[in-house]
Amino acid sequence: MESQAADYNPASRNLHGSSGEMKLRRRKSRQYVSAQEKRSPRRGLLGENTYLVLFTIALRILNCFLVQTSFVPDEYWQSLEVAHRMVFSYGYLTWEWTERLRGYTYPLIFASIYKVLHLLGKDSVQFLIWIPRLGQALLSAVADIRLYSLLKQLENQEVAQWVFLCQLCSWFTWYCCTRTLTNTMETSLTALALFYYPLEGSRSVNSVKYSLLVALACVVRPTALIPWVPLLFRHFYQEQRKLHLTLHHFLPVGFITFSLSLIIDRIFFGQWTLVQLNFLKFNVLQNLGTFYGSHPWHWYLSQGFPVVLGTHLPFFIHGCFLAPRRLHILLLTVLWTLLVYSMLGHKEFRFIYPVLPFCMVFCGYSLAHLKTWRKAALSFLLLSNVPLAFYTGLVHQRGTLDVMNHIQKVCPRGPDPASASVFIMMPCHSTPYYSHVHCPLSMRFLQCPPDLTGKTQYLDEADMFYLNPLRWLQQEFHSNASLPTHLVTFNVLEKEINTFLTSGNYERAATFFHTHWPERRTGSHIHVYERRLPGRVNTGGN
């Protein structure tokens, strides 16, 4: 397919013309190209307008710094925390690593960054937090540009611009695209792979590149294969040289990629293990992810998908009726992904994030055809998405990150590293851990591993704590010698544990806003309590 496209040249039709005609046409062609070059924007980076590329990169960097809230624990505990342990030899590995459900390939990216910073003597805690996120922001910017380039090939610049605009103003993309989540990496790799996928009209087809990006996405997160099932089957069905495609593209790329993943995991686990198979077995075949919550089958259709799309939803529906038939495969991919994830009990918004760029294609088609209402539609999208993006990025659930900045001040500066200790009495994995403190401070949090033995009445440590917080604390810390110097908790527990705080000589040292939408165990504010000890100066706070 690529060779045919490369060998085709429209000018070859005129090879048998006279020399005079050839000179005349060539002279006109040079004049035409010169005029076009004067009118066309400068091209360079990624084959696109340099200013457009720089604008996108700058926007995603700004995006990175304007997202100062937490979303889900995995953005720290399955990436930065693991990388911190790999490089600095201290950090916490969750139960998924004991069960070998996660692979080291993705954390190795951040571990490499940490190692370089360490060798340069620049491994400050702020660099450890922000540089990995800046890296993800740059990758997301490249994915945005590739989506724009693809639509310009498939349709025209006008449609491409509207798709690009829809992508940039999506509140959920803004909220997620700079986080160190496997879902974010999966989404970026999926968008990049789509650029090289053999869609009708695409001029950037490369089976090796797109299959390599898909394989990498599956190594990072095995469920990344789900959106690609219909796309891979379509490619295989339409390919005339099926055996060549399989033997010379798919199999070599898959073998090399997963062999590299296998070797990396062998080095760090100390034994041969195929984590992708373990991950699929646990989350898909055994459906044990329901330990962390289950939802009805229609949740993605009734809540998940509408929330992720937000106010883009009516334009997505409109665009589905307008898009050409050759792009129906993208709609089929979205529907297939929603169907497969709907069959699993445990559901989260982020699971369907990888198909959001696909949806933006149809939203862009809608806006491109709204001639009369286009300005009103654009104003509606901006006014509804920008405030929501800023609110979720700067306000909602920010306390769990702010409190870690305070805990950094607790890190011992003297020769006695055991002089301070922190107990985080919150729903497990509410906050980041050593990756956001970067000192060997004694810390503890409430554990919540799932039961893999089949017990019917299983309660983890966090469950037992919340049954009766005061009694649990009194039993756990029966002697004053074992009391931690600092306690971190949501404000909803303050009345229940007040007796314990008084008897332990704790006073509130700091308070941080967390959310306007408290629920159950999660409060609106986070309190830090410090134990008053003779001769000790409290760290204080705000």
UniProtKB/Swiss-Prot annotation:
The entry's keywords: Endoplasmic reticulum, Glycoprotein, Glycosyltransferase, GPI-anchor biosynthesis, Membrane, Transferase, Transmembrane, Transmembrane helix
Region (Disordered): 1-36
UniProt record, GO biological process: GPI anchor biosynthetic process; GPI anchor metabolic process
Lineage top rank: taxon: Eukaryota
Membrane topology per record: Multi-pass membrane protein
Glycosylation site positions: 480
Main localisation: endoplasmic reticulum
UniProt pathway: Glycolipid biosynthesis; glycosylphosphatidylinositol-anchor biosynthesis
Transmembrane annotation, as ranges: 52-72, 125-145, 213-233, 244-264, 304-324, 327-347, 351-371, 376-396
EC number of the protein: 2.4.1.-
A GO molecular-function annotation: alpha-1,2-mannosyltransferase activity
GO CC, one annotated term: endoplasmic reticulum membrane
Subcellular location field: Endoplasmic reticulum membrane
InterPro entries in UniProt: GPI_mannosylTrfase (IPR005599)
Leading EC class: transferase
Function recorded in the entry: Alpha-1,2-mannosyltransferase that catalyzes the transfer of the third mannose, via an alpha-1,2 bond, from a dolichol-phosphate-mannose (Dol-P-Man) to an alpha-D-Man-(1->6)-2-PEtn-alpha-D-Man-(1->4)-alpha-D-GlcN-(1->6)-(1-radyl,2-acyl-sn-glycero-3-phospho)-2-acyl-inositol intermediate to generate an alpha-D-Man-(1->2)-alpha-D-Man-(1->6)-2-PEtn-alpha-D-Man-(1->4)-alpha-D-GlcN-(1->6)-(1-radyl,2-acyl-sn-glycero-3-phospho)-2-acyl-inositol (also termed H6) and participates in the nineth step of the glycosylphosphatidylinositol-anchor biosynthesis.
Family listed: Belongs to the glycosyltransferase 22 family. PIGB subfamily.
Annotated protein name in UniProt: GPI alpha-1,2-mannosyltransferase 3
Taxonomic source organism: Mus musculus
